[in-house]
Each structure stands twice: as structure tokens, then as C-alpha cells.
UniProtKB/Swiss-Prot annotation:
ATP binds at residues 168-170, 228-233, 259-262. It comes from the Bacteria. It holds the Pfam family PfkB. Belongs to the carbohydrate kinase PfkB family. The active site is at 262 (proton acceptor). Substrate binds at residues 30-34, 88, 102-104, 170, 262. The lineage of its organism: Bacteria, Pseudomonadati, Pseudomonadota, Gammaproteobacteria, Alteromonadales. It comes from Pseudoalteromonas atlantica (strain T6c / ATCC BAA-1087). GO terms for molecular function: 2-dehydro-3-deoxygluconokinase activity; ATP binding. This is 2-dehydro-3-deoxygluconokinase.
């Protein structure tokens, strides 16, 4: 019996941050990539792939090695001859909120659709049980390539893949709200699982409540709608019908919120791929996000996360 397959689409970048000793350090991160790492950590039997563009620079070589260390295949890391990987610097304020500076314009990942066409590789891809992308996956592309990505995902869905999408709205990536809404709607149209935050919908569409988000999403063929509502908790809907509400549990401390949503998405999707109920999947995903915000950086140290996962498993069994 084959392992379930999970492919995430997007951009992994070099992450620069300053240590407590005022020294510069680097790692690798990106929203859908982070989610994929946490999915693999939660459900080790997953075969995980990351579809993106990389360069021929030294950071690209180190980056794909980083993927492999985390159990992520680099089989679909498509190499550009003249573009390198993107870079971002992160600074956290006293509340753990993050502030970014980016150097990603025309990075290799922004050329993804051209790289797919040039390599003529799509026809050789295996079946993917789950395809995951985000508003950022779309936002880095030209409009022509956004359309090509939506068409690619439509083809994968037609072959039996389930599609998951997180809006992850970043205003600076879009010409204006109308531009972002156009592509949000295109993404919702092809998605089976949607993981919006209330802030996404409020900022883009003016939705002031979870019920407004649910009513809006009823025009799409969304099977699972998981609305992250901050301190109000998480609300789950199955084919438009209310399923459950998981209350918000604050973390003991909040050091870095960089990957809270990414870890939530990864663990939730991994649980669902392991046939766990939506409510339990949300509980585990929320707990994982609560752990991640207590540590610096997008990817929590493996031993810390594994110990947390084991404690949670023991508690669940008990």
C-alpha cells in the first residue's frame, strides 16, 4: 500500500534574523513550505513534495538540502538558469508580532510556471492525494502565471487530487483589493478545503462575522471550511453546515507568531489525511500553533516538536 502524497506549491526563501547576541543567522522558510514541514512531522508516513523554483546559487543548494533534512522531496524543485532564491529579514516586537523586509522580486519561484513549461515535466508527475497552495503562492506570480497555476491545479483536481487553500492575504502583494479578490475567488472555485482567517475576509471583503464568511463561501464547492477567528477560536463547517467550534487557548508566552497559521494548516491537513475527524484535527492544529508561537523562527526544533506531539498523543489516548 502506497503512502499518501502531499504536494505544496509556493516559495521557500532564505530567512534572516538577529539572535539575542545581535548576530545574523539564516534559515529557510515560506508559508506553504512551513505547512508542509509541520504536516510531515505530524504524519511521518506522508510522502511530501514541494513544487517551486530555485536557482543555481549556493543558497539554493543549501535550501534543497534543508528540505531533505525535513523529509521533503526536492524532486519538483525546478532550476532557473538566471534567477536565484528570494530572501527576507524578520524582526519581532515585544508582543511577538513580526515585521518583514523582502528581496524576492523576480526570484526563481516567481518563474515557476515558465519552469514547468520549459521542463515539460507535468505529464510525468505522480498522483497527489492533496495539493496545497495559498494567496502568497498566487501573489508572487504575474497575472498570466496566476491563471496558469489555477489551470494546473484544476487539471490535478480533475485527476483526483483534493485541493486545499489558505488565503494568507498580504496587501503589498496585490495592486488593490479588487485584484486580490479576483484571484481569491479563482482559488476558492478550485478548492475542496479552505482555511481562511477572519482578518483575511474582513480586510478584503469587509466581512465582520464568521457567518458572513460562511455565507460567502456557499457559492463555491468547498467541502471543508475552517475559519480561524483569533480569540474567538476556530469554527468548522462541513459542506456549509456548522460542525464544531474549538475555543481559543492562549499560549503560555508569545515570542514569534511567524508560522502560527502555517503550522495550524500543516497539522490540520496531516490529521485529515490520516482520516482524523475535523474537530480533533483542529484541536491538534491549534495546540501545534500554540507551541510554535513560543519559539523563535518559522520551524521549531525537531526534538521540541516531537516531544510536544508525543505529549499530546498520550493526553489524547488518556
Amino acid at each position: 500500500m502506497r503512502n499518501p502524497t502531499f504536494i505544496a506549491i509556493g516559495e521557500c526563501m532564505v530567512e534572516l534574523s538577529v539572535t539575542a547576541q545581535n548576530k545574523l543567522q539564516h534559515s529557510y522558510a515560506g508559508d506553504t513550505y512551513n505547512s508542509l514541514v509541520y504536516a510531515k512531522r505530524w504524519h511521518n508516513e506522508l510522502d511530501c513534495y514541494f513544487l517551486s523554483g530555485i536557482g543555481q546559487d549556493s543558497f539554493s543548494t543549501l535550501m534543497t538540502a534543508h528540505w531533505q533534512q525535513h523529509g521533503i522531496s526536492d524532486e519538483f524543485a525546478l532550476t532557473s538558469d538566471d534567477h536565484n532564491v528570494g530572501i527576507y529579514a524578520i524582526k519581532n516586537d515585544d508582543s511577538g508580532e513580526r515585521h518583514f523586509d523582502y528581496w524576492r522580486k523576480e526570484s526563481a519561484a516567481t518563474q515557476l510556471m515558465s519552469l514547468i513549461e520549459q521542463s515539460d515535466c507535468e505529464s510525468h508527475w505522480p498522483h497527489f492525494d492533496l495539493v496545497y497552495f495559498s494567496g502568497i503562492s498566487l501573489g508572487i506570480l504575474s497575472d498570466e502565471d496566476k491563471d496558469k497555476l489555477i489551470n494546473l491545479i484544476t487539471r490535478l483536481k480533475a485527476k483526483g487530487s483534493k485541493v486545499a487553500f489558505d488565503p494568507n492575504y498580504r496587501p503589498k502583494m496585490w495592486a488593490n483589493k479588487a485584484h486580490a479578490i479576483r484571484w481569491l475567488e479563482a482559488a476558492y472555485t478550485v478548492s475542496d478545503i479552505v482555511l481562511p482567517g477572519t482578518e483575511d475576509h474582513h480586510d478584503l471583503l469587509g466581512h465582520a462575522s464568521v457567518s458572513e464568511i460562511v455565507n460567502y463561501c456557499k457559492q463555491y464547492d468547498v467541502q471543508e471550511l475552517v475559519v480561524k477567528a483569533g480569540k474567538e477560536g476556530v469554527f468548522a463547517f462541513d459542506c456549509g453546515q456548522a460542525l464544531c467550534h474549538v475555543p481559543f487557548t492562549p499560549a503560555d508566552r508569545q515570542l514569534d507568531t511567524t508560522a502560527a497559521g502555517d503550522s495550524f494548516a500543516g497539522v490540520y491537513l496531516a490529521c485529515r489525511m490520516a482520516d482524523k475527524p475535523m474537530k480533533l484535527s483542529i484541536e491538534h492544529a491549534s495546540a501545534a500553533a500554540g507551541l510554535v508561537v513560543q519559539h523563535q523562527g518559522a520551524i521549531v526544533e525537531h526534538t521540541i516538536f516531537d516531544a510536544f506531539r508525543q505529549r499530546l498523543a498520550n493526553h489524547t489516548v488518556a
